[in-house]
Amino acid sequence: MSLSLGIVGLPNVGKSTLFNALTRNNVLAANYPFATIEPNEGVVPLPDARLARLAEMFGSERILAAPVTFVDIAGIVKGASEGAGLGNKFLANIRECDAICQVVRVFADDDVVHVDGKVDPRSDIEVIETELMIADMQTLEKAVPRLEKEARNNKDRKAVHEAAVAAQAVLDSGTTLFAAGSKVDSALLRELNLLTTKPFLYVFNADESVLGDDAKIAELRALVAPADAVFLDAKIESELQELDDESAAELLESIGQHERGLDSLARAGFHTLKLQTYLTAGPKEARAWTIHQGDTAPKAAGVIHTDFEKGFIKAEVVSFDDLTAAGSMAAAKAAGKVRIEGKDYVMHDGDVVEFRFNV
């Protein structure tokens, strides 16, 4: 399963520095607008300590973590919805992503010039949201008359037309369709590929003064709720990537952080996309597989191979916690912790699974 988060932000907020840290790529990170033109894509492993334990238990030769894909997209400016700057390319690249990850600058640095001349997180967020909302308004302005005509001739299209009209009202009120939640049935509007229906995740690129200020962090979280928010220092994250684990832990402790910001970001990305993982293990590999929350066992099996879904018979399932408590698969079976589940079983995060299928 390949789902991606598009990293967006105004110029000079630290997008490419963050992306470099995520992927250890040397993407051009220059102090001028549009240093990123073609989107750069990077795949980052989702940190999962459970895999090392499974590999130890099963004698696995290698560990394969679930991938999280990030796309670094050109910096946006006011007027992007009208094609200003690299607006048209920006909007096209965003449409191809499954979620929007906005980097917001909250660090002070006189050597890195903010495009608007001042650091104002609320304003930065509003600029990008406004451009995305305007683009959606333009899409709906063309679509609503067409959908109205279709609804007159085909009653099945009536619900789509009504959802589009509701979406217009939400956008006119200055709210993104993601923030509107259940007020708009976004599933009905999937054919329009509206930008603000995509889930939002905010990354506040902060310095030590902000990272150590609980009140400021709470204020910024409230600013973007109900979306998830991650707080990190992109420069520090870049430095951490060059250090061994012991030195990295010392650096994190010195700035009062308990874990790498990138680990928090990868998990938040998974949460934003409503994803989870199930686990498989054997002599060759211990592996995490990405599925949607709510997926059934056959659907999950299909992530490994489509034949597994088509010929699904049953799944042997044990929770990771029950397996590790037992100490081995044999002991877990003896303790009655391994279950046989059928096609209607809804998967849970951390299920350790072996599928039975016939093709």
Residue spans of the language-model regions?
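Glycine-rich, phosphate-binding/catalytic loops in enzymes
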Residues: 36, 86-87, 117-120, 218-221
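Residue-level signal for pocket-adjacent positions within structured domains
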Residues: 22-32, 39-41, 46-49, 53, ...
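C-terminal-of-GTPase-core extension/linker across diverse P-loop GTPases
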Residues: 2-8, 13, 19, 146-348, ...
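Short, intrinsically disordered, mixed-charge
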Residues: 24, 56, 92, 96, ...
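Conserved Switch II/interswitch segment of TRAFAC-class P-loop GTPases
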Residues: 42-47, 74-84, 95-157, 170-183, ...
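Amphipathic alpha-helical transducer elements in NTP-driven molecular machines
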Residues: 34, 48-51, 64-70, 84-97, ...
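Conserved G1/Walker A P-loop phosphate-binding module
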Residues: 1-84, 88-111
